[in-house]
Each structure stands twice: as structure tokens, then as C-alpha cells.
Amino acid sequence: MKKGLIEVLFYIVLVFGVSFLLTTYVGQRTRVNGESMYPTLHDDDNLIVDKVSYRFSDPRRYDIIVFPYRYKDMYFIKRIIGLPGETVQILDGYVYIDGKKLDEHFCDEKIQNAALASDPITLGDDEYFVLGDNR
């Protein structure tokens, strides 16, 4: 009886341990909250976030990423538009990278409010420029 209980407890601890390792280092489920990535992602869509790929390669333009915001347990889902070292600017509703208009096949709408990006922004070595698809 005692041996059976110890065995059950061992497997319970093992399952929780493996689950913790997987969600911490490999992948994690998240839910889309809002329309900022519409039409690509919809409100309440469920996603699996890959936590491994960027350990082996750098993020690329047009990748969709999940990143933490300033507050604990708050994350954004956006698309990478500008890469480290590039200069990004939004003119007349379109994104320009290093002075060349960016071809965005996933987004046909013009950007209504360029905000700070109406002036050129040169990205640092570890900076990315991200936007939602719903502009």
C-alpha cells in the first residue's frame, strides 16, 4: 500500500515537473485579447508561443512575436517590421525602411496615426520596430 502511494506521488510530481519545464522553456499557450492583430489573429484566438526558436536564430521581419509589457503578466502580440540598425519612418500611411517603402502583403490599410514614427527612428543593436496588423 505504501509503495503504491509513493509511486503515485512520484508520477504526480514528475508530470508537474515536466509541465513546468515545458511551459517555462519550450512553449506556452496564450490567448489573443483584442483586435490589434486582426485580420491575422482574432480576439480570443488561442496560440502556442514557441520559446525555443530565437535561442538558435534572430527574429526576422514579419515574424509575429509575443513580448512582455511594462506590467507583470501583460504581454503584447505584434509583427516585427523594423530590424536592429534600420531606420523606420511612417510617411503618408506607409512604412519606410531605410528610405524604401516596405511591401506589406498581409496589410492593405494605410496607417492612420504615425505618432512618433512620423519622424525617422534609427533602431539600436537590440531594438525592433513592431506593429499590429490592424492599422
Predicted regions located by residue number:
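Soluble "head" domains of membrane/secretory-pathway proteins
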Residues: 2-6, 10, 16-17, 21, ...
